[in-house]
Each structure stands twice: as structure tokens, then as C-alpha cells.
Amino acid sequence: VLAGPGSGKTTVITHRVKYLVEQCGVEPGSILVITFTKAAAQEMRQRFEKLMEGRRLPVSFGTFHAVFFSILKRAYRYDASNIAREEQRTRIIRELVDKLRMDVEDEAEFTSQILTEISLVKGEMMDLDYYYSKNCSEELFKKLYQGYEKAMMDKGLLDFDDMLVLCYELFTQRKDILTAWQNKYRYILIDEFQDINRVQYEIVRMLAAPRNNLFIVGDDDQSIYRFRGAKPEIMLGFEKDY
């Protein structure tokens, strides 16, 4: 479903969930609704409950990160203490900048930009050997990226992109775990689909298979709201993929 801002896209999702439950006899626990922000997920849940006149049904509403982290928690026993705080990630990059004796003009800005680039490489599933940094030489970026990954691993920490990458790897390597989640979530609905990145899309495609009951809502002209690494062309190619 493609439509502009304020046209009722969210309403379409909540009404579709109601229709699936009431008209199609779908088990509420097998429905997964994914959004991009925690606030959007909470609002969607509230609107759905209001629509159902207060009936609390076990439909899952959550962000990509919340949904995928819950999958990782069950597989690897992770908990909230494993999620890196922003200052921890920043400190790792700053220590690497000192270690590599890099001369940067504005350390805070440079650190922020490098973390954004690391996120982009993970989210778009890029090969590090073919990524050209906008902020430093390819050789230095590779050292920063690898140093960051090692430090995170040594500390037992995950960033938000790791949640996605690890979930992708888990589903790729453990068909039994993938099948269990495919059987749990038989109907998947996604809001603001134009903000999706490559790794999120690949996980969703695996999770939705083999039934492919995938319902997406987005605005093909919302590039101004683009999330980190979002690829609007994924949405535009959706009909070709399915």
C-alpha cells in the first residue's frame, strides 16, 4: 500500500489486523506488526486495542530491533546489559583514533560520522573491501571498523546493527530456529516500509517464507524522513520480488 503522509496508512494496518482476526479466523499470536520507532509501535498497539474495544489480544507490535533482539535473546541468552550505550561506542572509536595516531580536526564529529558509516556497512551488508569512506582513507576505515568490532566482541556488547546482522546469520545457519519463528509469525505487517534497509529486508523475507503473507505500507515520496541507510528502492522493487 503506497500513500502519502496523513492519508491513514496506520489505520489500514490496524484495520487489516482486525479483519485477519475477526473475518479470517487468524490466531492473533501469529500476527507480527513491525514499525521503525518505539513510539509508533506503542501508538499502533493502543489504536488496535481501541479498535477492538479494549480486548487485549496477543498480536505482536514492535520495532525491527525489539523483534529481532527478542529472537536473539532466546537463541543466545542475551539481555539488555549486552546492548552498547552510545557513550561506550563513542569511547571505542576515540580510543582507536588515538591508537592509530589519527589527526582529526573535530573528534566528536569524526567519531559520530565513523559510527554512522559502520552502521551503513552493516545495514547494507557491504563488503568492507569495496567500501570507500567519506571521512578517512579506506585503509584507516578498515582498521577502525575491525578494531571497533573486536572491542565490542571483547566486551560482550552489541550495537543495534549487530542485532540485525546476528539475526540474519542465525536464520541463515539454523534452519530449525528459522522454521520455528516462521511457524510462529504467519502474518507480517510492516509500517513505513520506505525506511527499510538491506539486512532488515533480507531477514523479513526469510521470516515471511514460505507463506509470504507480507503486507507493507509506505510512502514512496518520504525520502526526507530517510532512516540511516534506508533504501526506498527496496520498497519500489517489492512487487518484482513478490
Each model region followed by its residue ranges:
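P-loop NTPase Walker
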Residues: 1-79, 179, 233, 237
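Conserved helicase NTPase motor core
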Residues: 1-2, 32, 40, 60, ...
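Short alpha-helix boundary/capping elements
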Residues: 17, 68, 119-126, 208
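Short amphipathic alpha-helical segments
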Residues: 45-47, 73, 94, 201-202, ...
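ATP-hydrolysis module of ASCE/P-loop NTPase motor domains
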Residues: 56-58, 76-162
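Short, intrinsically disordered, charge-balanced linker/junction segments flanking boundaries
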Residues: 239-242
